Swiss-Prot record:
Residues 530-578 are annotated as: Disordered. The lineage of its organism: Eukaryota, Fungi, Dikarya, Ascomycota, Saccharomycotina. It is a lipid-anchor; GPI-anchor. This is Aspartic proteinase MKC7. The gene is MKC7. SUPFAM superfamilies: Acid proteases (SSF50630). It comes from Saccharomyces cerevisiae (strain ATCC 204508 / S288c). The active site is at residues 99, 360. GO terms for cellular component: extracellular region; fungal-type cell wall; fungal-type vacuole; plasma membrane; side of membrane. It catalyses: Hydrolyzes various precursor proteins with Arg or Lys in P1, and commonly Arg or Lys also in P2. The P3 amino acid is usually non-polar, but otherwise additional basic amino acids are favorable in both non-prime and prime positions.
């Protein structure tokens, strides 16, 4: 879902509201020889969306390959992956964010009252100060650099937004583009309402419609989209989540006389038109230092992960609300632990309580229940700052003594360096923020700081997710089409042991011990040797398996093997952390520390 980097409180994942009927048209006309769609995106970080977008040196234009797939270029702004659409006749260019945490496509209308007539002067604040205490006053001058409206939430206030745009709330709409329906000869409005709100207090409302629509030469006309004639977000969204999360189905404001339904969103349109064979896609976000990554619709790239690819079911945490099928990408976390260095006696299990986890590419950092974050913070030496709601700690600089956070998803393990979850406050400071924030919600959100080290395949047809440790070495592509199931993926040992009800999080246990004679191998950073052209499609030869091996030969509570992601200068930052939105974030944190 689309969450601001500066979100202080995330109590609601997504709020959808009233829509009567979005309507569905014929499927698009797509080339019959295409079997998957490939999106290569660039990762950029800047003090604002506009500044990052202006940095276009070396940026590749959208293009179409002549062989068996479509190539679409994306850019990543503050952990948001964006793509440029052509809408209408004649075509108008509009940029939208690609989001796994929502399912609708909407664009900003040219009549949006929040749009300024020219790029916003950053001397004026675009933030509503709910509680003008001393802290808010200190950081106000820093916050003005963000060009979309949001609400700063303090302990004495709750997040709100109103639908009346004031001068201080105006946003720059020119950078990402708007859609003028009156200038398109082919636009058809359904005259039905669209409305959606996000956890960062951005919102959009307007009407549903249809028009000529394409991503470069990839014609996706027939995909329903909404034109937001009122939004406080600088950019629209291309949601690629489950159909149950479409606002026509899960909108909380649907009245009793408004029938809820699902429609064919972007991944479904690709399948039903024949451009891909399954409603599935894989995400390779690449490591935090890289400037590029990949989304494959309808395919998996075996060269982008290390070890085995394990499959687990998507779970339904909203069945009690009447949803018979899952509506968001949630899976079961069966254990959370840490390791210190390369010593096997330094393995620690924080909990084995089953907790729902949302995998969300639209969230920059990660969020966990308050009590679980406290367990983790105590283990890694972080202390809580009540001034702004995050844990702080010393930045990690000695790689040989580095700790890692280990996630048990059901008998297979994914590991991230602790420094991957650290946010550098200032290059001259040794203080880092733990990029796992506490929240009152009993679920977990794993955002970009987790996904950057994980290869994820979202199988919407089978309601499953497959994951493996990401492989950052440049070993070429081993792309295989996804048909009835994800090729080469193994069912996780704990596939059937899923979350069923919310429980209090209990500390302790041993997630590194399972049934007798079972063996799990884990590779945090593994390179693959190139395969010959005559080898089977998707096969790979592993040249290094030194990262991590967890051997389980008994059912006792002791564990054997080493748990340590391999050190690699190509995948690690020497300064002991990853800068989030520099230099803005550095100035924001520096201002806070000067105040407290």
């Amino acid at each position: 879902m689309k969450l601001s980097v500066l979100t202080f409180v995330v109590d609601a994942l997504l709020v959808c509201s009233s829509i009567v009927d979005a309507g569905v048209t014929d499927f698009p006309s797509l080339p019959s020889n295409e079997v998957y769609v490939k999106m290569n995106f660039q990762k950029k970080y800047g003090s604002s969306f506009e500044n990052a977008l202006d940095d276009t040196k070396g940026r590749t234009r959208l293009m179409t390959r002549d062989d068996d797939y479509e190539l679409v270029e994306l850019t990543n702004q503050n952990s948001f992956y964006s793509v440029e659409l052509d809408i209408g006749t004649p075509p108008q260019k509009v940029t939208v964010l690609v989001d796994t945490g929502s399912s609708d496509l909407w664009v900003t209308g040219s009549d949006n009252p929040y749009c300024s007539t020219k790029k916003k002067d950053t001397t004026g604040s675009s933030f509503k100060q709910v509680n003008k205490d001393a802290l808010a006053s200190v950081v106000e001058s820093v916050f003005t650099e963000i060009s979309y409206d949001t609400t700063i939430v303090t302990s004495e206030a709750t997040a709100t937004f109103d639908s009346t745009a004031s001068t201080s709330q105006l946003i720059d709409c020119a950078t990402y583009g708007t859609f003028n329906t009156s200038k398109s000869s082919t636009f058809n409005s359904n005259n039905t309402e669209f409305s959606i709100a996000y956890g960062d207090t951005t919102f959009a409302s307007g009407t549903w419609g249809h028009d000529q629509l394409s991503l470069n030469d990839l014609n996706i006309t027939g995909l329903s989209f909404a034109v937001a004639n009122e939004t406080n977000s600088t950019v629209g969204v291309l949601g690629i989540g489950l159909p149950g999360l479409e606002s026509t189905y899960s909108g909380v404001s649907l009245s009793s006389v408004q029938k809820s339904y699902t429609y064919n969103n972007f991944p479904m349109v690709l399948k039903n038109s024949g451009v891909i064979k399954s409603t599935a896609y894989s995400l390779f976000a690449n490591d935090s230092d890289s400037k590029h990554g990949t989304i494959l619709f309808g395919a998996v790239d075996h060269g982008k992960y290390a070890g085995d690819l394990y499959t687990i079911p998507i779970i339904n945490t909203l069945q009690h609300r009447g949803y018979k099928d899952p509506i968001q990408f949630q899976v079961t976390l069966q254990g959370l632990g840490t390791s210190k260095g390369d010593k096997e006696d330094n393995l620690t299990t924080l909990t084995t309580t089953k907790i729902p986890v949302l995998l969300d590419s639209g969230t920059t950092i990660s969020y966990m229940p308050t009590e679980l974050v406290k367990m983790l913070a105590d283990q890694v030496g972080a202390t809580y700052s009540s001034a702004y709601g995050y844990y702080i700690m010393d930045c990690i600089k000695e790689m040989e003594e580095e700790s890692s956070i280990i996630f048990d998803f059901g008998g297979f393990y994914l590991s991230n360096w602790l420094s991957d979850f650290q946010l550098v406050t200032d290059s001259r400071s040794n203080i880092c923020i733990l990029g796992i924030a506490p929240q009152s919600d009993p679920t977990i959100i794993l955002g970009d700081n987790f996904l950057a080290n994980t290869y994820v395949v979202y199988d919407l047809d089978n309601m499953e997710i497959s994951m493996a440790q990401a492989n950052f070495s440049d070993d070429g592509e081993y792309i295989e089409i996804i048909e009835s199931a994800v090729p080469s993926a193994l069912k996780a040992p704990g596939y059937s042991s899923t979350w069923s009800t919310y429980e209090s999080i209990v500390s302790g246990g041993n997630m590194f011990s399972t049934a007798a004679n079972s063996s799990i191998s884990y590779f945090a950073s593994t390179s693959h040797s190139a395969t010959s052209s005559s080898s089977s499609k998707g096969q790979k030869t592993q040249t290094s398996t030194t990262a991590l091996s967890i051997s389980k030969s008994t059912s006792s509570t002791s564990s054997t093997g080493m748990l340590s992601p391999t050190s690699s200068s190509s995948t690690r930052k020497e300064n002991g952390g990853h800068n989030l939105n520099p230099p803005f974030f550095a100035r924001f944190i520096t201002a806070i520390f000067h105040h407290i």
